[in-house]
Amino acid sequence: MTPELTRFGEEMSHLTGVRAIMKDIIETLQAGQGQLLINLSAGNPVILPEIEQLWRDCTQALLASAEYGQVVCRYGTSQGYEPLIAAIKDDFNQRYGLALSDRNILITPGSQALYFLAANAFGGYHATGRMKDIVLPLSPDYTGYGGISLVPEAVRAYRPTIIQDEASHRFRYRPDFSQLAIDENTGFVLFSRPCNPTGNVLSNADVEHIANLAAAHNVPVLVDSAYAPPYPALNFTAMEPVFGENILHCMSLSKAGLPGERLGVAIGDPAIIQVLECFQTNFCIHSSRYGQAIAARAIASGALAQLSEQVIRPYYQDKFAVLAAALDQALPQDLPWYLHNGEGAIFAWLWFDQLPITDQELYQRLKQRGVIVVPGHPFFPGLRDNWPHTRQCLRLSLTASRAELAEAATRLGALVTEVYRAPPSQSGATPSMAVPAR
């Protein structure tokens, strides 16, 4: 049966971003069973023994409690499981000196669902018929943002400033405030901090500047804090959440070891929370109460924050250091390659300036050498101009073993050297690929 789809149905029934590439990656992994394939594409967190044990302990406590039946055998409120809301409120008030009430917090079925709710509550066509943009102020950013709106043309990203250190082969992105437009045509602003895929951590000053620009037009700012402190605390540089009247602090417990339970948290102004809660009631009623109940125990006890700092962060920070050292050794110093500063998250982001082939071609040729990465172009959702930089980057996951990361860097270095050294006719270069990235 092939029912006719609406315009929205057509939009939402297609895979976007990395999810479209994952089909090819899965087929490659299945076809390559028995081969030595190094998979640096994964977004799933590593199952760390201490973290798994925490969730086992919290589950055992829930099973033994008198409230078990009330948690899993009954519906709850759309706002979320009350003990979890209380645990988050108390922790944030104590940790950051806030004065949150229960009405400042909403629990959602994952942070992706939260951004979908916000995108379609604040972005797109308003009652007057005017389009309100969903502004991504720092591109590249999370590929999933490309699929959150029922009105895809509402998503608008801005090219960043690139800060290079040629001697160390490092770089980082920063918002280009001379180009960034947040005005009466903006519905809301969204960015990740730390950033997936780059690991970039926007400074407090930059976050506050974005929030101030938005506040002048009564525009909410959603900060995707899926990798931020206090849990999972996947920041490798000092940072704290930034709060403000128009800032919605958005968390996920996926990288804290609960991706299967789909738990997102929004913290912000009650007026914004109320809109999203009503949307969620119509959308899915509420998030899984089982996941909320075990999360409430982990947060209230302090165990989740402690293990995030003592186990989760050091694990991935060490992996980044291993990969960075291996890349420094494997990639020639005279080639224009740059590794984004390791500021957080579970990925490394590589830029090959003036790359003679596209990132998609590099991805395909790396597969032939037994290394699976993610090409960078899906991480520029909403970017309107034709920027060669979008076809010059790769995302590498830090979930592989130390030995696999080192071997992958060696294979990548050999291939990239061949690509840059080859005559244009052999490298597959095209004029559009042979121009500087800026």
Give short role names for the model-derived ranges.
Residues 335-370, 436-438:
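Conserved PLP-binding catalytic core of the aspartate aminotransferase-like
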Residues 2-5, 11-110, 166-178, 299, ...:
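N-terminal small-domain helix-loop-helix segment of the aminotransferase-like
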Residues 43-47, 112-113, 141-144, 194-197, ...:
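Short, solvent-exposed loop/turn segments at secondary-structure junctions
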Residues 70-217, 222-243, 248, 420-438:
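Conserved core of the PLP fold type I
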Residues 41, 268, 349-356, 373-415:
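Conserved PLP-binding active-site segment of the aspartate aminotransferase-like
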Residues 39, 310-324, 336-352:
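Conserved glycine-rich beta-strand-loop-beta hairpin in the small C-terminal domain of fold type I
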Residues 131, 150, 243-317, 329, ...:
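Conserved core segment of the aminotransferase class I/II
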